[in-house]
Design a protein with these regions (language model features):
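Acidic (Asp/Glu-rich) sequence patches and key acidic residues
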Residues: 1-110
Length: 110
């Protein structure tokens, strides 16, 4: 199994010292599943922190919704898509795009 850590956090534009973790999606998954997630998010490197833009975030959620609608339980990556969609929808309610700079940390270990 591969340890995958995707951590979203926000830094308030009102007070940059204030940071809160929106969601930590740490999980043990197969290497194939981790590669699928990283490819889906267009992430090429290990241990990477990136700025998250609203358009990118919303496009990712829409891409996952479309994928899920075309899958059936038991299909390859169905559980991964369902899991990610649930976590990202949870994060979406926590973000105020007008006040927060959102960052995503990604790391994984074999």
């Amino acid at each position: 199994m591969t340890e995958l850590n995707i951590n979203f956090y926000s830094v308030s534009k009102l007070d940059p010292r204030y940071s809160k973790t929106l969601c930590d999606t740490t999980n043990k998954r197969t290497k194939k599943s981790v590669d699928f997630i990283l490819d889906l998010m267009c992430i090429k490197d290990n241990d990477l922190t990136v700025d998250v833009k609203k358009d990118w975030f919303e496009n990712l959620i829409n891409k996952l919704k479309t994928m899920k609608s075309q899958m059936m339980p038991g299909m390859e990556h169905y559980n991964t898509v369902e899991y990610l969609l649930g976590r990202l929808n949870f994060i979406a309610y926590e973000i105020d795009w007008n006040l927060d700079d959102v960052k995503m940390y990604v790391g994984y270990w074999d």
